[in-house]
Design a protein with these regions (language model features):
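Glycine-/small-residue-rich active-site loops that bind phosphorylated ligands and cofactors
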Residues: 12, 34, 109-110, 136, ...
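PLP-dependent aminotransferase-like
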Residues: 70-159, 166
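Short beta-strand-to-turn element immediately C-terminal to the catalytic PLP-Schiff-base lysine
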Residues: 181-182, 196-201, 241
Length: 288
């Protein structure tokens, strides 16, 4: 039986090798390894792609989650709703800002939070909902946004599985107050190593994160508040710019494979098969 890898990083890099190596040579020539033109260009291109005012690169998706929570004022004494199948990084981020995670049951049809249980878990201490678009399937955003608005809950999206996913024609990552993306090696939009991006339409949140990722430095060597060392370097920005150009094409291929897999497995009653999303949802099938 042939060995078919789940992900072939070599082939993926070969497709962009010429563009990436050319970009690397330019970075080496300028010796501008951090906070250079490739980072700024990627942030502009990704914000345009998602449909938000701001995109901010950072070191990894976990850092993105921590900084997003802090920028939204989440901290000690607050509760954050989180679906029970979320990745450990979501739990860790809530823990590290001093808040309390409150787990919500999972809806097996959407892999997102069960909305009835979500409503039951809301208390006066509930500050935010950290919503994961699991496996690349957009969550039930209309109902979730209505719940958040009614109870005054901040919506923070974890779209690490969902680069390019759409809900009613609008990109995931543009619905919440802020959204977080991991661009690690196995993600749909992947760097050659760890990387992350934060998107938002909120100018104040964007400003906080922009300085938070560089030790709280509003001016060089002048830290106005405690921050982090969480920068997206120029080399990773070169790679992500190249990959972003073909992201929609790659996601469409994933949808085609998912549909063929669903059809081929549909006659096995004992097998739970990834359900087809609603017609107004466009999944990117990070996992099937």
């Amino acid at each position: 039986m042939p060995n078919i890898p789940l992900l072939d990083l070599r082939r993926g890099f070969a497709e962009i090798e010429e563009e990436v190596l050319s970009g690397f040579k330019e970075v080496f020539a300028t010796q501008k390894l951090l906070n250079g033109k490739n980072l700024l260009s990627f942030e502009e291109e990704f914000a345009r792609y998602i449909g938000t005012k701001h995109a901010l690169g950072c070191a990894c998706g976990t850092d993105a989650l921590v900084m997003a929570l802090l920028a939204c004022g989440v901290g000690r004494g607050d509760e954050v709703l989180l679906q029970a199948n979320a990745f450990i990084a979501d739990f860790e981020a809530i823990h590290w800002v001093g808040a309390e995670p409150v787990f919500v049951d999972v809806d097996p049809k959407t892999f997102g939070p069960d909305l009835d249980d979500l409503r039951k878990k809301i208390t006066p201490k509930t500050k935010a909902l950290l919503l994961v678009h699991m496996y690349g399937d957009p969550a039930d955003l209309d109902e979730i946004l209505e719940i958040c608005e009614r109870f005054g809950i901040i919506l923070i999206e974890d779209a690490s599985h969902a680069h390019g996913a759409e809900y009613k024609g609008k990109k995931v990552g543009s619905f919440g107050k802020v959204a977080c993306f991991s661009c690690g090696p196995v993600k749909n939009l992947n760097a050659l190593g760890d990387a992350g991006v934060i998107t938002t339409n909120d100018d104040e949140v964007a400003s906080k994160i922009r300085y938070m990722r560089v030790h709280g430095q509003v001016e060089k060597n002048h830290s106005h508040f405690p921050g982090f060392n969480s920068r997206l370097d120029e080399l990773q920005a070169v790679i992500l710019r190249a990959r972003l150009k073909t992201l929609d094409e790659k996601n469409e291929k994933r949808r085609e494979i998912a549909q063929k897999s669903r059809e081929g497995l549909s006659d096995i009653p004992e097998l739970f098969v990834h359900p087809a999303p609603a017609p107004y949802k466009k999944s990117v099938y990070h996992r099937f």
